[in-house]
Amino acid sequence: MNIIAQLEAEQCAKIEEKRQFPAFKPGDTVRVMVRVTEGTRTRVQAYEGVCIARSGGGLNETFTVRKISYGEGVERVFPVYSPLIEAVELVRRGKVRRAKLYYLRGLRGKAARIAEKRDYRKKGEKGVEKVETTPVSADIETQVAE
């Protein structure tokens, strides 16, 4: 590991200690709390929309959020490790089969909706849990290879 990558990893770890983001993917509806400075006043502004892309890695990782404001599509790119981002809330999970949802730019109205992912939680549980996957055992891999 070169020294630049090592320094970036240390900075990422330091920022992640201060705040935790939920694990979200393209297709998920998120609410991003952004610190906005107007003159001498600062306030926190909520920006809610569909995450249409995640790109980059390390300190340069970004995600793009698209929303419809007064009939116009508005997209905003947020750096994941920006100090201006106060929090990211996961509003709902979306069921998509693509990593980049740029095709939503050409769709209007009901065609631009994304189906909600069903997670079959028990009654009374709140929030979305991260589903853990188990690695495939070696004997199953050999059966598939034969």
UniProtKB/Swiss-Prot annotation:
PROSITE patterns per record: RIBOSOMAL_L19 (PS01015)
Gene Ontology BP terms: translation
**Gene Ontology CC, one term:** cytosolic large ribosomal subunit
Annotated region (Disordered) at 119-146
Care to name a GO molecular-function term for this sequence?
Answer: structural constituent of ribosome
Q: Which InterPro entries match?
A: Ribosomal_bL19, Ribosomal_bL19_CS, Ribosomal_bL19_sf, Translation_prot_SH3-like_sf
Write the record's keywords in alphabetical order, separated by commas. Ribonucleoprotein, Ribosomal protein
Q: Which PANTHER family match?
A: LARGE RIBOSOMAL SUBUNIT PROTEIN BL19M, RIBOSOMAL PROTEIN L19
Q: What does this protein do?
A: This protein is located at the 30S-50S ribosomal subunit interface and may play a role in the structure and function of the aminoacyl-tRNA binding site.
**HAMAP family reported in the protein's UniProt record:** Ribosomal_bL19
Which family does the record claim for this protein? Belongs to the bacterial ribosomal protein bL19 family.
The protein's name in its UniProt record:
Large ribosomal subunit protein bL19
Which gene does this sequence derive from?
rplS
